[in-house]
Amino acid sequence: MLRGYRAVFSPFYGDVCRYYPSCSAYTLQAVQEHGVIFGGYLGVCRILRCHPWAAGGVDDVPLRGKRRYRMTAFGFVVATSQGKA
């Protein structure tokens, strides 16, 4: 779906994304790094942050080990411990 967007719609809009990498590249990297569900979630959150009043700038995909939340085998999202007792 991302590749279709990049092939069909992206040439009409040009390079207008306020962030680097672009929203479609960010979503593709997020899906490759975190899988379809969490990577897709990160991509949607990024698209919601990308608007005309956003400051923009460099916004890399978070690394796999740096998440504050994790998904259980049953699909529930739970907070990870931050090493505090």
Curated annotation (Swiss-Prot):
Keyword Ligase applies: no
This protein's UniProt keywords: Cell membrane, Membrane
Location in or out of the cell: Cell membrane
SMART domains assigned to the protein according to its UniProt record, in alphabetical order: Haemolytic
GO CC, alphabetical: plasma membrane
Primary location class: membrane
Entries under InterPro entries matching the protein: Membr_insert_effic_factor_YidD (IPR002696)
Membrane topology: Peripheral membrane protein
Entry keyword annotation includes Cell membrane: yes
NCBIfam families, A to Z: membrane protein insertion efficiency factor YidD
Its job: Could be involved in insertion of integral membrane proteins into the membrane.
Similarity section: Belongs to the UPF0161 family.
Protein's recorded name: Putative membrane protein insertion efficiency factor
Organism of origin: Leifsonia xyli subsp. xyli (strain CTCB07)
